């Protein structure tokens, strides 16, 4: 299951391993369409942590990583940004993006 993290625990959440963060907002249509894709991805890739950050309730991480459009997906490896994707993506595209960093 994909969980929402807050700005208070964001840094700890990305500190180790492969972590895909979905920057989203409740009012964003494409963000809502991405949710089932991320749930399927989480089931298929259990070694990758997939989390969401609501940019309205937790704006600091979005500002820190210069997120200007949503949905924005950022892949972190051991706390460092290694990939970024903006907009709605399908599961296969996300698997390719992640597989480059395993």
From Swiss-Prot:
Disulfide bonds join 28-31. One of its GO terms (biological process) is cell redox homeostasis. One of its GO terms (molecular function) is protein-disulfide reductase activity. One of its GO terms (cellular component) is cytoplasm. Keywords: Disulfide bond, Electron transport, Redox-active center, Transport. The keyword Transport applies. Residues 1-102 form the Thioredoxin domain. Pfam families: Thioredoxin. Gene3D superfamilies: Glutaredoxin (3.40.30.10). PANTHER family: GEO12009P1 (PTHR45663:SF11). Participates in various redox reactions through the reversible oxidation of its active center dithiol to a disulfide and catalyzes dithiol-disulfide exchange reactions. Belongs to the thioredoxin family. This is Thioredoxin. It comes from Chlamydia trachomatis serovar D (strain ATCC VR-885 / DSM 19411 / UW-3/Cx).
């Amino acid at each position: 299951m994909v969980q929402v993290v807050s700005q208070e625990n964001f840094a700890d959440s990305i500190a180790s391993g492969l972590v895909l963060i979905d920057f989203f907002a409740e009012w964003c249509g494409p963000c809502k369409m991405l949710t089932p894709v991320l749930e399927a991805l989480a089931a298929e890739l259990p070694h990758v942590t997939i989390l969401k950050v609501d940019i309205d309730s937790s704006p600091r991480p979005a500002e820190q990583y210069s997120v200007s459009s949503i949905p924005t997906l950022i892949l972190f490896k051991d706390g460092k940004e290694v990939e970024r994707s903006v907009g709605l993506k399908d599961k296969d595209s996300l698997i390719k993006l992640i597989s480059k960093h395993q």
